[in-house]
């Protein structure tokens, strides 16, 4: 078995640089979408509905793109077609978003933006494993983490910096110029960064990957599918029952209508798992649904615990992304009118706050977590 060539620092840089641009786009979305929605007439109560694209596209797009990118090979490569398609669509969404004049168009553009970012971002996570030998994985993921943090800091700070350079932050008849220019610059940065990675890297072809001991293209692990075929339907009906219970509880307990979505997702997963199990039992397990559900059901216990942690952490993150701008604008800047200069000054300051938390998180991830992991 051959070993992959050692990558020098320049090679490590090229492999992960696209993530810098992707995170600029992601940070612009997180720090500014509530401001855009409210500027276009969305109420505070509407924000959670308008933001629903973000978690749903991640939930649906990531496993699908991950599944297909593992099984793709074209003359342009394995992951790079996804990089390119996602980057082009995300850049277009960033260019169009700040010129939205009606609320529903901005909400629709968010669906395109978030889905496109996920299309490009998900294969980037696997790209390090594809391109690097195992003894370089730590260095590769560390540099990727650095680019993630740097992109998030830069994207979050764009409107604040433009305001201090003299660009108007007033929302006169639409999105403020600071936000508009930030999205345009962010779209260009995202596209150029991803194109840099595409243009400076060459993926190993299937024969080379096989020589390195990697699974052959399209080769699927049969164990998850066999395990899925052997499963009973009890857990699937339990998911459906849990979802139905949540749906019933919403009016009884006067819960927010957004909770209906959680119940619907649990029901949908239960139905999907029944279909996946029946397909696996019928000898038709080599399909995306059975493979994805089989991988999910067969996760190690540690990963299931991590998934629970991620559930609560991402719940908190979305609450922060959705509501920080209106809360800071109202209580720290005394403004509730999204067209006012004070409100948009508050929106700029939220970008600074988000830049700080991203910067601190990156430093902790690079300096503290490796030492902590070594002790566990």
What are these regions (language model features)?
Residues 26, 112-124:
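Core transmembrane helices of Major Facilitator Superfamily
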Residues 81-102, 251:
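C-terminal ends and interior cores of transmembrane alpha-helices
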Residues 43-53, 177-178, 256-267, 334-362:
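Loop-to-transmembrane helix entry
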Residues 60-77, 363-376:
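Helix-to-loop junctions at the C-terminal end of transmembrane segments
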Residues 1-9, 101-104, 120, 134-318:
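Intracellular loop-helix junctions on the cytosolic face of multi-pass helical membrane proteins
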Residues 33, 119-133:
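Intracellular juxtamembrane helix-capping segments at the cytosolic ends
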Residues 2-57, 246-252, 304-340:
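Helix-loop boundary and gating motifs at the non-cytosolic
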């Amino acid at each position: 078995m051959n070993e992959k060539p050692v990558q020098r620092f320049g090679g490590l840089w090229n492999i992960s640089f696209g993530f810098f641009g992707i995170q600029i786009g992601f940070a612009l979305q997180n720090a500014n979408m509530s401001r855009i929605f409210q500027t276009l007439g969305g109420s505070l109560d509407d924000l959670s509905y308008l933001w629903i694209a973000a978690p749903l596209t991640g939930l649906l797009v990531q496993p699908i793109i991950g599944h297909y990118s593992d099984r793709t090979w074209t003359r342009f490569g394995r992951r790079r077609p996804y990089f390119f398609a996602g980057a082009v669509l995300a850049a277009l969404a960033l260019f169009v978003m700040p010129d939205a004049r009606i609320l529903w168009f901005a909400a629709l553009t968010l669906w395109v933006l978030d889905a496109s970012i996920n299309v490009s971002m998900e294969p980037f996570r696997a790209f390090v494993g594809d391109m690097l030998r195992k003894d370089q994985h730590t260095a590769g993921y560390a540099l990727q983490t650095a680019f993630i943090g740097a992109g998030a800091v830069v994207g979050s700070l764009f409107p604040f910096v433009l305001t201090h350079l003299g660009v108007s932050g007033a929302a006169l008849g639409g999105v403020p110029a600071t936000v508009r220019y930030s999205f345009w610059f962010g779209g260009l940065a995202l596209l150029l960064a991803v194109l840099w990675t595409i243009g400076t890297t060459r993926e190993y072809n299937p024969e080379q990957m096989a020589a390195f001991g990697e699974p052959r293209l399209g080769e699927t692990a049969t164990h998850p599918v066999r395990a899925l075929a052997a499963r009973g339907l009890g857990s699937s009906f339990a998911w459906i029952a849990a979802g139905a219970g949540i749906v019933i509880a919403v009016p009884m307990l006067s819960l927010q209508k957004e909770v209906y979505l959680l119940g619907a997702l649990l029901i949908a997963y239960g139905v999907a798992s029944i279909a996946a199990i029946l397909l696996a039992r019928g000898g038709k397990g080599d399909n995306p649904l059975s493979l994805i559900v089989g991988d999910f059901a067969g996760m190690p216990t540690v990963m299931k615990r991590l998934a629970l942690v991620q559930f609560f952490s991402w719940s908190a993150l979305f609450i922060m992304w959705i509501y920080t701008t209106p809360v800071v604008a109202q209580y720290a800047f005394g403004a509730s009118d999204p067209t006012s200069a004070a409100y948009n000054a508050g929106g700029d300051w939220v970008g600074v706050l988000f830049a700080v938390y991203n910067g601190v998180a990156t430093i902790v991830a690079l300096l503290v977590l490796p030492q902590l992991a070594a002790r566990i």
